[in-house]
């Protein structure tokens, strides 16, 4: 029996062609293969991957295997898989469990499959995006001790998760404790997952060391900012074919993702309004020329609404009842909790095409909801471009190498990659853009108190 679940394995050739193109746009990963591949630095590593199964992720997976690792993979979002990418990786012999449009039970079943190795063994590393794989290693052992904690799901997502976990508790006693004991560390990709890790660490519940990849400068200041700047408008246009020029758009949240989203909409010709709870971010938005208002003040005036906060219930049903007919509502944060989708389920839904729905209120007014409130840039489009993902995924690869080769160095806490690796990731991407670095003279380096070859900034420097 094939050790993969994909939509259509015959898409593998198509996927392989796009992977080949992506490789030319991902210099960091290709340089990492060239540097570490000959020594097979990850030989013996078994990596359970939970991250959007895209063409760019395929290049990451094949970088990990080129470095000697064994890998099993699932997507971290029910809509984000690119089926030709999953097929290409499965055809190459890597077990992949992902297709676009999974239901929630399938999603959590596949999240479990990445821990079930072909020989009955377990993985020893996790590469996570959003923290769901790590969650199983924390919640699972608790449920083994007290199954009653799975009896009261608070939402549709927990209902599916708890159902799958109950099945594993019955069929594989001790499974969760075994995987927790086997894992030597996790590298986490995104803001939401990092937030979960810090919460676990504060409660002394983090079962293994964690590297926060998200807060590498070459991740958060590039992927989150420049990636969203390109992919948000791409998703809205693919989903709706709407003309952005002249429209009023609201971006909820002005962190790195919000900054990229606001820039994306502005470049598309929209007039952008920002909502914020943080006075520093609000001032940044105002100084960039954006209006800063409350959602309550603009709900009935805007044409497009985008959430980018990482919080819950940012746009409520009451907010949506105030919106214009055919206003577009979407989310570019990791989870689907930012828009009150559960409350919208009480109204009439009509699928226009995959990941595009009309939701009709009793008064006849309709909204256009994209990707059911999940990540719009991966649900309605193909996510960030390859080049910016190369920086993020080079950080992920270096984090996996660090966890594998320096296990004794880390305790069960959350760490970031050192500055010299951040600078290395940036350096690997300069040549592709034709950028040339100026070299410090020794007297200049001495004058500002840094090594001639870097690191050039202290850890607390804000880029």
Swiss-Prot record:
It holds the Pfam family AdoHcyase. Its main location: cytoplasm. It is found in: Cytoplasm. CDD domains: SAHH. It is an enzyme of class 3 (hydrolase). One of its GO terms (cellular component) is cytosol. PANTHER family: ADENOSYLHOMOCYSTEINASE. May play a key role in the regulation of the intracellular concentration of adenosylhomocysteine. This is Adenosylhomocysteinase. It comes from Caulobacter vibrioides (strain ATCC 19089 / CIP 103742 / CB 15). The lineage of its organism: Bacteria, Pseudomonadati, Pseudomonadota, Alphaproteobacteria, Caulobacterales. The gene is ahcY.
